[in-house]
Amino acid sequence: MITMKKIISCALSAALLAASSLSLAGCHGARYRDAFAVPDTFDETRHYEITFWAKNDTNKTQTEIYENAIESFEELYPNITVTLRLYNDYGKIYNDVITNISTNTTPNVCITYPDHIATYMTGDNVVVPLDDLFSDPSYGLGGSELKFDSPSFDEFVPQFIEECRLGTNYYAIPYMRSTEACYVNKTYVEALGYELPEVLTWDFVWEVSEAAMARNDDGTFAVNGQMTMIPFIYKSTDNMMIQMLRQQGAGYSDAGGNIEIFNDTTREILREIASHAESGAFSTFKISSYPGNFLNAGQCIFAVDSTAGATWMGSSAPHLDISADKLVDFELAVYPVPQYDTSNMQMISQGPSICVFNKADPQEVLASWLFAQYLLTNEVQIAYAETEGYVPVTLKAQNDPSYLDYLSRAGEDDDLHYAIKIQASQLLLANAQNTFVTPVFNGSTSLRDASGQMIENTAKSVRRGGVVDDEYLDALFEDVKSMYHLDEYGKKDLGPLPKTSVTLLTCLGITWVLIGAYVVYGAVKRKKE
């Protein structure tokens, strides 16, 4: 005889089985990693092979610094072998990491940016949160069991380490820091009848740039006697837009990933840029090429580029990308980027950071952390900072006597002590408190790209005879939203639940109803008895 108890029991089992099946189906293809926990000790009886992905263009000195750091580290830890893989572009590192996440073949240690890390973190326990490693008394920052002199947490430049906090945890350590500088042909500015102010303003740069467009009767430009003159060239237009918005207190994005860039201030900025691009007074790297080349050839007055590119700026620069016969002798000045409010300077902080990827073996992760931490030692920090207009990320290195001696010898030669390079570093050292970074979230890389794309599109449009009006800007905003999928980030209506989720929730609901029915049935039966 089929009893009520059996009916309910069978129905309950079926519902639970269906719910379990759907739950497993929903997880098909997902890769789960256990969260990393710091081991009590580092097992030095085992051998570890770790990979380190880093960026380098053509600077052989930087490559040698990485190689020397690896060699020195392996002498301290002979049971750890570090394999270096160099890239010439951060974007390629980013793409390769994304590709390798799905196959669990990420590198152990990687030079990267917080924007990129935010995307890596969409995977499950992919990037190691470093808080517990920072504070570990044995192997953390300044730990007692380390075989090298590591900085303590308090010896980081505060602004630089805070840039590596994503949400409530630290997911990176800073490696090097730079900012943008405006490299100015002071000779031409004065020839045009102007005197450089203490702080550059956007109004000043635009005015001088337009004045430099005056031509002689033979068609040459009056300021340089050449047929080519682009007074103002910006290398990174995403940074240009970001800083112009920040300086005016306008929206870009918030920490929650809500996109705020499509506002009236952005429209005003683009109209301003359009007017100067139309006259020929302004251009970009993507449109015209590297600003340093035009600057060194006497064909540019204001060249904005990273302080990490200072060795390419000036007619006596250690690195030149044009032939000697094209060089023009001039006095070069190094300034922060132009400002709207000189009493409240705002300049972007940039430069690579280091993240550690999670692995199945906690000992392997600890070995990776030891190497990442070794890159913070004074020897590595100072050597790498001296290759360009970088600054070390620790106060420990910045105050090291050898680094202070290096800074004091600016201009002694046009190589290690190239004056412009050291001035670029000093610019950031003097303005660290004025630096900022943009909010980091999954999608912040796309927003950054979109901010520069709007400037590029605007400049190209007016050069082709287009008109930048409200109709154009409306269309531009919609185009970049679509191109970079910006409607997918921030607060939005997620729409109805997938059918699988609806079915799963229905099964769970039925399960609880049947459980309740079974309890009631039992109570009634006991009462009758």
Identify the function of each model-found stretch.
Residues 42, 114-179, 221-225, 327-338:
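Hinge/lid segment of periplasmic solute-binding proteins
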Residues 47-51, 56-118, 293:
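Early extracytoplasmic/lumenal segment of secretory-pathway proteins
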Residues 131-155, 198, 223-224, 230, ...:
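Short, solvent-exposed loop/beta-turn-alpha elements that line the ligand-binding surface or hinge
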Residues 162-175, 180, 203-258:
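Extracytoplasmic/periplasmic solute-binding protein
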Residues 208-210, 255-286, 332-333, 337:
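Glycine-centered hinge/linker elements that transmit conformational signals in sensory
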Residues 275-282, 318-396:
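Extracytoplasmic/periplasmic substrate-recognition and gating elements
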Residues 332-339, 385-453, 457:
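Long, aromatic- and glycine/proline-rich binding clefts that accommodate carbohydrate-like moieties
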Residues 420-529:
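Conserved C-terminal helix/tail region of periplasmic/extracytoplasmic solute-binding proteins
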